[in-house]
Amino acid sequence: MQKLIQDITKEQLRTDLPAFRPGDTLRVHVKVVEGNRERIQIFEGVVIKRRGGGISETFTVRKISYGVGVERTFPVHTPKIAKIEVVRYGKVRRAKLYYLRELRGKAARIKEIRR
């Protein structure tokens, strides 16, 4: 039974996504269905956490929209994500960047590294 579950989940894992870590700035292209139309919506922000593994792995992206912080959690292997672009690679020393929630303006900047 365990082998069967592993085989099914292995088929659904995505391999077309770039490598990214907390601190990186991503542009996530999400498929949104409105009535009978489907369109692509772009959500750009900083990865503040990545958790889980395998098919249940998720990541959370945070951005500031009109002065209000917006966080959105995506499953990594969902078909709703059309593509992910890495805009910048950030250098951080934590796996979970919850402290960014309290910071405003220039204090919330993350140092960029070249990869």
Curated annotation (Swiss-Prot):
Keywords, alphabetical: Ribonucleoprotein, Ribosomal protein
MF-aspect GO terms: structural constituent of ribosome
A cellular component term, taken from the record's GO annotations: cytosolic large ribosomal subunit
One Pfam short name: Ribosomal_L19
Residue stretches spanning the membrane: none
One record GO biological process: translation
Keyword Transmembrane helix among UniProt keywords: no
Function: This protein is located at the 30S-50S ribosomal subunit interface and may play a role in the structure and function of the aminoacyl-tRNA binding site.
Family to which this protein belongs: Belongs to the bacterial ribosomal protein bL19 family.
NCBIfam families named among the record's database cross-references: rplS_bact (TIGR01024)
Protein name: Large ribosomal subunit protein bL19
The organism of origin for this protein: Bacillus velezensis (strain DSM 23117 / BGSC 10A6 / LMG 26770 / FZB42) (Bacillus amyloliquefaciens subsp. plantarum)
